[in-house]
Regions:
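Asp-based, Mg2+/Mn2+-dependent phosphohydrolase catalytic module
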Residues: 1-7, 15-17, 62-65, 89, ...
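Acidic-and-aromatic substrate-binding clefts and catalytic sites of carbohydrate-active enzymes
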Residues: 45-47, 80-83, 134-136, 194
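Alpha-helical substrate-recognition element adjacent to the catalytic core
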Residues: 30-58
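Active-site neighborhood of HAD-like aspartate-dependent phosphohydrolases
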Residues: 1-40
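Metal-dependent phosphoesterase signature
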Residues: 49-90
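Hydrophobic alpha-helical core bundles mediating ligand binding, dimerization, or RNAP-core interactions
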Residues: 20-31, 47-52, 71-79, 112-116
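Residue-level marker of alpha-helix boundaries and capping positions
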Residues: 43, 82, 164-166
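Short, contiguous strand/loop micro-motifs
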Residues: 39-40, 77-79, 129, 161-162
Length: 217
């Protein structure tokens, strides 16, 4: 039986309607100042439990008062434009109503965490990269959330133990990474070029499987 489902956040359960890319703007400002801005700088921004200004300070990016305000406004505009996909709201409700545990497992910077939690107040479990200091597909992030939920991944052939699924739009982070940790990862193809194209369909596949297993037991 499937006992838990992990969801990616951006591109899966939420979308950004007005992208301003404040962190990308910050990194560009650092390069403009002659700083060495590397992929590790971006990784730090996603794994540090720091506000936006704290990231700039840590990376040594000097911001004038006007530039700081400009980037802060860009961040707030992007945050305020985040909205849930309607199919995500329905799918999560259907899974939870059936007794399946639901969690969000996502790579994101600190300001985005409260927004996700606010949009889905009924989701109790979260694994956010900025809180854990690692990003997907590091196996620790998947193991952490499974531990929080009290589920044990890796039991696909043991009918006595619950199985854990994940779905998202990244092959590396939401399919391959989870599978390496014993979680059956699935890809969401919102462009309709794949077997799973929306989360309502995914939820019904999960519920149908559990129903079939109950009837066969």
């Amino acid at each position: 039986m499937i006992s838990a489902v992990l969801f990616d956040a951006f591109g899966t359960i939420v979308r950004i309607r007005r992208r301003t890319n404040p962190y990308l703007q910050l990194m560009r400002e650092g390069r403009r100042q002659g700083l060495s801005i590397t992929p590790e700088s971006t990784h730090f921004a996603m794994t540090a439990n720091l506000p936006f200004a704290g990231i700039a300070d840590h990376l040594g990016i000097a911001l004038s008062a006007s530039k700081r305000m400009e980037l802060s406004e860009a961040l707030e505009k992007e945050l305020s434009s985040i909205e849930p996909y309607p199919d995500a709201v329905r799918a999560i409700a259907e899974l939870q109503d059936s007794g399946i545990l639901v969690a969000v497992c996502s790579n994101l910077a600190k300001p985005y965490g409260p927004v996700i939690k606010g949009l889905f107040p009924n989701i109790e479990y979260h694994a956010f990269s900025f809180e854990l200091g690692v990003t997907k597909p590091d196996p620790h992030i998947y193991r952490f959330i499974c531990g929080q939920m009290g589920v044990d991944p890796g039991h696909w052939f043991d009918p006595e133990k619950g199985q854990v699924l994940m779905i998202g739009d990244s092959p590396k982070c939401d399919r391959d990474g989870p599978r390496a940790a014993g979680i059956m990862g699935h890809l969401l193809h919102r462009d309709a070029h794949g077997p799973i194209t929306d989360l309502t369909q995914f939820a019904r596949l999960v519920l149908d499987r559990n129903r079939a297993e109950r009837l066969g037991s």
